[in-house]
Regions:
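Short helix-capping/linker segments at secondary-structure and domain boundaries
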Residues: 57, 157-162, 182-190
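Helix-centered, glycine/charged polyanion-binding patches within enzymatic domains
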Residues: 83-84, 89-168, 172
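Amphipathic alpha-helical core segments of compact helical bundles
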Residues: 15, 151-154, 184
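Charge-patterned, long linear interaction tracts outside catalytic cores
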Residues: 168-190
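Proline-rich intrinsically disordered, low-complexity coils
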Residues: 18, 30, 118, 125-126, ...
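Polybasic low-complexity intrinsically disordered regions
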Residues: 3-102, 115, 175-181
Length: 190
């Protein structure tokens, strides 16, 4: 159990909330917020998760309004025993933040292996671009494990849209769903 949680993957997904005001209070969900992803606006919550790289199991779940940026939640998703942390480009600069965890409990420095944006790769000379793309592909293939958890929650459990109002209820529901997803993922053959 000593090697568990040494290599972590952090990621988040948007859980939509009904934006309709056709209810008794004529109001939208007060804790849900809007966010633009690509060219599409979403209204709802964000589920931030920390996943063990080797087992693919979720160890930390944090739920916020959708407008909370990924990098803000990085330190809350880490256990303190990490040696390396993988994340998408939303976590760029996580190691430079004031609240970032730079050393684990053993005193070793934590390596943040965050995917770069494609525009950052194109800025380099063409000879170096091939090597950088290969490195980014390796990071992405490791990071893909977290998407399996989201596939179970959103696909198998069909929890793409919230059924409750309020952050407390969303947190309770998503904690339960990710725990159930862990049971499903732990039961699959390797």
């Amino acid at each position: 159990l000593g090697d568990v949680y040494k290599r972590q993957i952090v990621d988040s997904t948007i859980i939509a909330a009904p934006s309709s005001t056709k209810n008794q209070g004529k109001q939208r969900d007060p804790d849900a917020h809007q966010v633009k992803k690509g060219n599409t606006w979403h209204f709802g919550y964000k589920a931030h998760v920390g996943v063990d790289k080797d087992t693919g199991l979720v160890h930390t779940v944090e739920v916020t309004g959708a407008n909370t940026h990924d990098v803000v939640m990085t330190s809350k998703l880490l256990t303190g025993d990490e040696e390396s942390v993988y994340g998408d480009s939303g976590y760029l600069g996580a190691d430079k933040r004031e609240d970032s965890i730079r050393r684990n409990r053993q005193g070793r420095s934590i390596r943040y292996r965050i995917n770069r944006r494609p525009s950052q790769i194109r800025k380099n000379p063409t000879r170096a671009q091939g090597q950088l793309k290969c490195r980014e592909h390796e990071k992405s293939s490791i990071r893909a494990k977290v998407e399996h958890v989201f596939a179970v929650v959103k696909g198998r459990f069909r929890y793409r849209k919230t059924r409750y109002r309020g952050l407390r209820k969303q947190t309770a529901k998503l904690n339960m769903l990710f725990a159930l997803a862990n049971l499903i993922l732990a039961d699959r053959p390797c």
